[in-house]
């Protein structure tokens, strides 16, 4: 079962071993569930999402850290929207929310190129990368704007919607694709390289 991933973590003495053990446990569990050489598209879809879910719940795995950051972003989006509805000042919250650019930089440096170059999966890099940049740039422009009129608030709501949609796409499209393709060695490389980035809302890249 994919839940065996969690027990596998306790066999490694280091985070590196934990990641490797988790990947091995997932791979073995999927092999056990194979009933034939050919699987239907539905089976592949389910397997892909089960694998991504297992890795997202594996402490120490890069997908766990990415998901933890996304949960924080989603909470901040809700807080900003709530403050706007009450007519509150969201300037500080907008400035803080720009930390999402760090998350986007990690994807742009560590995930998109690997998918496109090594696996020739260009969709995420061709589409999501552009949207990431647009969200980042719009947040920067909004943060610098002094006139917080109705038009400004509409722009805030619009960019929050796009950021929220990106979280959904990462969870349901990007992460499952990565989970089905990246090797344990590649995940370990992402884990190591992520240490070079600043933390997001205090969430360490561990």
Predicted regions, residues:
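Small-residue-biased structural context
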Residues: 1-101, 105-206
